[in-house]
């Protein structure tokens, strides 16, 4: 019998190496037990940094004593893109990575918010280096994350993303819905990224002489008159999975035929493997 090779997976995020979301992801990956895990993540929160990286000031890299068992863990005084660059170009340049995961983010990264997201920025960087990658984000708050069945789903997402063959490596943007009434998630939907986005309302915090201090953290949803597939999936308690190589994304490299093939492949592979209660229509 041929032994199945374990994947080499890098995990990063933008909430910081001590965040709850990355710990949840490590737990699920360890439960699924199909990969060797390597963490390279920011020491501090880097939300909203998109694909920013340390161009002028040097960044530091040091071993981190992670509380869960992984192959290696490193903390970076920089952005998620810094983490990916250091992982690929320095730490693992002699032993290639199979996949990069970013998350689980505390808050959704759907619609056009993916332009701002440092969670998504990390997987874009991975794709630029020819490595498939998945961004994972929990709507509203990480406390809404439902762990039941997620180890098998995460594994099937990882294996599908690595196995998918195209001119460009696959990048998936996965968002988990916030079920405020604690009802179980209905399943997972392959969607396209929507046009919805969050925008910050400038709020004056204080003034010191002529200097004013503002925050843009007061975020509001802006939606189109016609809701996107992604928006409807999340609103109806489905997990959404949107490719980052389709329309409404910075790298629209898939033709309509290729996109249809990707969707069919996803539904035959990931949806079939995941132990979830799938329904036919969005309610």
From Swiss-Prot:
UniProt cross-references to InterPro entries, sorted A to Z: SurE, SurE-like_Pase/nucleotidase, SurE-like_sf
Residue sites binding a divalent metal cation per the record: 14-15, 47, 105
Leader sequence residues: none
Cofactor annotation remark: Binds 1 divalent metal cation per subunit.
Top enzyme category: hydrolase
Cofactor requirement: a divalent metal cation
A single Gene Ontology CC term: cytoplasm
Pfam families for the chain: SurE
GO MF terms held by the record: 3'-nucleotidase activity; 5'-nucleotidase activity; exopolyphosphatase activity; metal ion binding; nucleotide binding
Cysteine disulfide partners in this protein: none
SUPFAM superfamilies, alphabetized: SurE-like
Top-level taxon of origin: Bacteria
NCBIfam families: PRK00346.2-3
Known function: Nucleotidase that shows phosphatase activity on nucleoside 5'-monophosphates.
Name of the featured protein: 5'-nucleotidase SurE
């Amino acid at each position: 019998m041929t032994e199945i090779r374990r994947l080499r997976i890098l995990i990063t995020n933008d909430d910081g190496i001590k965040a709850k979301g990355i710990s949840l992801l490590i737990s699920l990956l360890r439960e699924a037990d199909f990969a060797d895990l390597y963490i390279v993540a920011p020491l501090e929160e880097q939300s909203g940094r998109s694909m920013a990286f340390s161009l002028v000031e040097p960044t530091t890299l040091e071993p981190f004593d992670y509380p869960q068992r992984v192959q290696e863990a490193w903390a970076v005084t920089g952005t998620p893109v810094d983490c990916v660059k250091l992982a690929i170009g320095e730490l693992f340049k002699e032993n290639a990575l199979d996949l990069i995961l970013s998350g689980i983010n505390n808050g959704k990264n759907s619609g056009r918010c993916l332009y701002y997201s440092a969670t998504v920025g990390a997987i874009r960087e991975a794709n630029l280096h020819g490595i498939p990658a998945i961004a994972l984000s929990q709507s509203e708050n990480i406390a809404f994350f439902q762990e039941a069945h997620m180890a098998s789903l995460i594994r099937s997402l990882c294996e599908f993303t690595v196995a998918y063959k195209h001119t460009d490596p696959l990048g998936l943007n996965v968002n988990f819905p916030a079920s405020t009434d604690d009802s179980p998630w209905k399943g997972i939907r392959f969607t396209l990224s929507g046009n919805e986005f969050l925008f910050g309302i400038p709020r004056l915090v204080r003034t010191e002489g002529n200097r004013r201090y503002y925050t843009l953290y007061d975020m509001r949803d802006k939606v189109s008159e016609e809701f996107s597939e992604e928006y409807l999936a999340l609103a109806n308690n489905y997990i959404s999975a949107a490719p980052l190589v389709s329309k409404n994304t910075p790298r629209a490299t898939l033709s309509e035929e290729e996109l249809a093939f990707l969707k069919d492949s996803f539904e035959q592979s990931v949806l079939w493997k995941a132990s979830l209660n799938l329904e036919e229509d969005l309610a």
